[in-house]
């Protein structure tokens, strides 16, 4: 019986864990990353080092793999969408488009009737100052921030006046809340609409 070939975009820590779990299931892993220092390189069966829009690599990757997934959310949507037009990408690229952007993500969660902290989209310093009622708050870049990067704690209007905002970025201002507990919930839906 032929082994399943799993294509994984991104080579970080989650890619390592995915490769280790796949080995236990006798799944062959092909990791594609644009980072030569990717830790998953050491755990994958095959490693492709290239930027994600390399046509030659796209052709090779999609011919070699049976399924495609990604191990972090910052794979460009257009790349995932292109790959998905050739070979199925799971989760669907549209889901990743939402989680790549904190504003879209918060809107989506609220549309599901799940309450979040109060938040506002911020385009410039005037927006920031006019939403002082949310202070103290966290100002975050709408995209590409993770593990504390692109995040700024604002305690008062003076902090808002002193912060420098990039004209090339959208931001989200999130009201601080007193946490009693933080939990993470992962839900898996299989193709036959079974949930775990």
Where are these predicted regions, by residue range?
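Active-site nucleotide/adenylate-binding loops and adjacent lid/helix of ATP-dependent enzymes
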Residues: 98-196
């Amino acid at each position: 019986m032929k082994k399943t070939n799993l294509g994984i975009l991104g080579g970080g820590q989650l890619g390592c864990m995915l490769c280790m779990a796949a080995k236990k299931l006798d799944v062959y892993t092909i990791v594609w990353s644009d980072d030569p220092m990717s830790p998953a390189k050491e755990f994958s069966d095959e490693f492709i080092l290239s930027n994600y829009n390399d046509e030659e690599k796209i052709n090779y990757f999609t011919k070699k793999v049976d399924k495609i997934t990604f191990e972090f959310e910052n794979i460009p949507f257009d790349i995932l969408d292109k790959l998905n037009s050739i070979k199925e990408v799971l989760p669907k690229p549209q889901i990743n488009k939402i989680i790549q952007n904190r504003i879209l993500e918060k809107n989506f969660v609220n549309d599901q009737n799940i309450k979040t902290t109060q938040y506002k989209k911020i385009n410039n310093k005037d927006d920031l100052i006019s939403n002082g009622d949310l202070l103290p708050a966290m100002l975050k870049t709408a995209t590409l921030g993770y593990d504390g990067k692109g995040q700024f704690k604002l305690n008062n209007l003076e902090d808002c006046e002193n912060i420098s905002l990039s004209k090339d970025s959208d931001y989200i201002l999130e009201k601080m809340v007193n946490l009693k507990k933080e939990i993470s919930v992962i839900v898996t839906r299989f193709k036959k609409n079974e949930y775990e």
